[in-house]
Curated annotation (Swiss-Prot):
Similarity remark: Belongs to the asfivirus I196L family.
Domain of life: Viruses
Keywords: Late protein, Repeat
Lineage, top ranks: Viruses, Varidnaviria, Bamfordvirae, Nucleocytoviricota, Pokkesviricetes
Name of the featured protein: Late protein I196L
Sequence repeats: 28-48, 49-68, 69-87
Stretches assigned to coiled coil: none
Stated induction or repression of this protein's expression: Expressed in the late phase of the viral replicative cycle.
Annotated organism of origin: African swine fever virus (isolate Pig/Kenya/KEN-50/1950) (ASFV)
Length: 196
């Protein structure tokens, strides 16, 4: 049912250019589903669904759901490895950390070719994280992410998911980070290009 809705949504969205970008986050008050290694996604949602949009001014407006508030993301995004809010679970791999996946995804911003997670020392292939549609075609525009403004916003999107977020507590788990690229492309996030 959700897939049909997304197809309908894309059919009725008029895309004019790739100058601005917004992220539509379809989630719930608490998303407690663990994403399995087979990349199947079956979210268990609560009664209160929320929709959070990231506007093209590169900031995330506060969204209140019950007693939980998501605040704006800072522009400071660093590569340091000491993210204390990440899980220290070692069941996946000692060499696999959320920041490693973050770097792998971020490296796709400067790459117009097709990459896999194994190219970055990770364990499974993934589709291109950034899905951008041109005005006259439904195919992804591979070089659209080379625009600096899109890079800046997209990096903030990644920061939104890798930081400790009470709205999506399951993202603290390494197993979920293994499928972050698929999540961004399917259930939780839809990247839309709209007018400036």
């Amino acid at each position: 049912m959700l897939f049909r809705y997304l197809v309908w949504l894309f059919r009725f969205i008029k895309v004019k250019n790739v100058a601005s970008i917004s992220l539509l986050v379809i989630g719930s008050n608490y998303l407690t589903t663990a994403i399995a290694n087979n990349t199947s996604i079956s979210p268990t949602t609560s009664s209160n669904h929320i929709t959070t949009a990231i506007p093209n001014n590169t900031s995330i407006l506060p969204t209140t759901s019950s007693n939980h508030i998501t605040t704006a993301i800072s522009n400071n995004i660093t590569d340091k490895d000491d993210y204390t809010h990440f899980s220290t679970d070692k069941t996946i791999s000692d060499s696999l950390t959320p920041i490693t996946l973050y770097r792998a995804i971020r490296s796709t911003l400067n790459d117009t070719g097709t990459k896999t997670m194994t190219d970055h020392g990770l364990t499974r292939p993934y589709r291109p994280t950034t899905v951008i549609f041109h005005s006259d075609t439904s195919l992804p525009v591979k070089n659209a992410t080379r625009d600096n403004s899109i890079k800046k916003i997209y990096r903030q999107v990644i920061s939104f998911f890798i930081q400790s977020n009470p709205l999506f507590p399951c993202f603290k788990n390494h197993e979920v980070f293994l499928n972050l690229a698929n999540i961004l492309n399917t259930i939780l996030c839809i990247i839309l290009i709209k007018n400036v």
